[in-house]
């Protein structure tokens, strides 16, 4: 039975990790190489992530630098960044692109907070799905006579506690990100 609990814990941790990754992709006014993670580039007849055709670094707090490995890919990477709806305007400098980050206005900050709330809700839903799977497993185990009713209740309480801790972590991460976004 502890194997199932460990699996639930791993899946809950996965929901938190996915939420952290989503939050990292939100632009908060500070440069981060994660901001470009979602950008796909048309390269060599296929679509690939930007980090497979270039090196993304942050030389300054408000600047992202993209060092493209193949000179023929400069135009494709530039186009992918401009068309990404992130509001970036790269400056081409040989095989490097420099991306200055403008200040976020109040409206954009509120939009980002709203987006982060959506990410948080998706993470909470994922945690609840894991809880439901755990509860269903326990009910089936009790019905099949593998565990007693008391064991089922005790383990259900453990699953609920794990879910509450996961949702609490998600809420804490969300409030930290909100504060970071709204910081002027």
Curated annotation (Swiss-Prot):
<dbReference type="GO" id="GO:0005829">
    <property type="term" value="C:cytosol"/>
</dbReference>
<dbReference type="GO" id="GO:0002184">
    <property type="term" value="P:cytoplasmic translational termination"/>
</dbReference>
<dbReference type="InterPro" id="IPR002661">
    <property type="entry name" value="Ribosome_recyc_fac"/>
</dbReference>
<comment type="function">
    <text>Responsible for the release of ribosomes from messenger RNA at the termination of protein biosynthesis. May increase the efficiency of translation by recycling ribosomes from one round of translation to another.</text>
</comment>
<dbReference type="GO" id="GO:0043023">
    <property type="term" value="F:ribosomal large subunit binding"/>
</dbReference>
<keyword id="KW-0963">Cytoplasm</keyword>
<dbReference type="InterPro" id="IPR036191">
    <property type="entry name" value="RRF_sf"/>
</dbReference>
<dbReference type="Pfam" id="PF01765">
    <property type="entry name" value="RRF"/>
</dbReference>
<dbReference type="InterPro" id="IPR023584">
    <property type="entry name" value="Ribosome_recyc_fac_dom"/>
</dbReference>
<comment type="similarity">
    <text>Belongs to the RRF family.</text>
</comment>
<keyword id="KW-0648">Protein biosynthesis</keyword>
<protein>
    <recommendedName>
        <fullName>Ribosome-recycling factor</fullName>
    </recommendedName>
</protein>
């Amino acid at each position: 039975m502890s194997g199932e609990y460990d699996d639930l814990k791993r899946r809950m941790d996965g929901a938190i990790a996915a939420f952290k990754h989503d939050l990292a992709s939100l632009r908060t006014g500070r440069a981060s190489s994660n901001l470009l993670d979602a950008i796909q580039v048309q390269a060599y007849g296929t679509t690939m992530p930007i980090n497979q055709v270039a090196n993304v670094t942050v030389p300054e707090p408000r600047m992202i630098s993209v060092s493209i490995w193949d000179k023929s890919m400069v135009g494709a990477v530039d186009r992918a960044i401009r068309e990404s709806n992130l509001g970036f305007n790269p400056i081409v400098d040989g095989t490097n692109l420099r991306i200055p980050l403008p200040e976020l206005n109040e409206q954009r900050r509120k939009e980002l907070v709203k987006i982060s709330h959506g990410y948080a809700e998706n993470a909470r839903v994922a945690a609840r799905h894991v809880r439901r799977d755990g509860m269903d497993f326990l009910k089936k185990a009790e019905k099949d006579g593998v565990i007693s009713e008391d064991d089922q209740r005790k383990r259900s309480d453990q699953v609920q506690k794990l879910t509450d801790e996961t949702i609490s972590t998600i809420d804490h991460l969300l409030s930290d990100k909100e504060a970071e976004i709204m910081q002027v």
